[in-house]
Amino acid sequence: MKILILKPSSLGDVIQALPVLRLLKQHYSAAEIFWWIDTALAPLLEGDPDLAGIVRFERRRWGKLQHWPEMLRSIRWLREQNFDLVIDLQCLARSGAFAWLARGKLLVGLDEAREGACGFYDLAVPRASFHTHAVDWYLAVLPPLGVPVHKDFIWLPERPQLAAEIKRKGVAAGARLILLQPGARWKNKRWPAKHFAALAGRLAQKHPDARFGILGDRGDHPLGEVIAQAAPERSLNLCGATSLPEMIEWIRRCDLLITNDTGPMHVAAALGRPLVALFGPTEPRRTGPYGQLQNVLHLDLPCSPCLKSECHYEKPEECLRGLSPATVLGKIDTFRLKPPSDQPI
């Protein structure tokens, strides 16, 4: 049996879709499963034990005429695979078209698909309610296929070879590690850097044995520098300094992640690591940290969640600016922060 899953982006969305892969492989142990993914996120799935291969997709290149021959070769390859099942979890016109062009025997998607993608599907799976979490909605494609849904699976398999990198950075076994994620794709999903810095300073005072790591991409490096100054001798600005697999292992190793609504938040939820998630314009019941919604902080404003990437409230971005460091610290105080002595280094 051959199966193709289409979920090219983003990081958080791909993480939330991984349970579909895990349960398909458990049910169809001999199946060859392929994943269609954005080239930038391919390292997330490279070497995954449940995949027979990944199909790289580079949206910006394929939108240009000179790259059409490459696109046609990919389509030809997809057709040659003779997939028995194609599952489109991206549900946009592009992914729906590629799913249809793969000519699988059965094409399944989600019934809230945008841009007319539903027209490509043999079966469109409804969302149970507006507030149904993305993970549960993705998993809803499985029962119609005869695949049971349960939680007995490893979401993100460990990569022990990367643990040495953490040790090289100076975080020894048994040390308490607190990670902070100040960036986000939407500007209005970012808790202010000055708030992160103030929080880090308070945490450094309360936990003198703690080390701090600031996660993010290269563009977040200035934010990381601001935050690191709160405890300069105990902070590592990791923004732009880790690969995607390395970032995952840093989160696996941490005692606590303090994060905006972004990809690393979903990584921590998948790994079962303690987190505090700061939400503003988005709806945590739909896309919050799965299994840890009780650890979400957000303000109950008339406009929130607006689900918009730009703020139009009379007090700009008040949904996050109004969350004080003291409020976040109070939430953190409810955790019993213990060094993860059972975490391999």
Regions found by a protein language model. Give the residues of each.
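Catalytic machinery of carbohydrate-active enzymes
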Residues: M1-I345
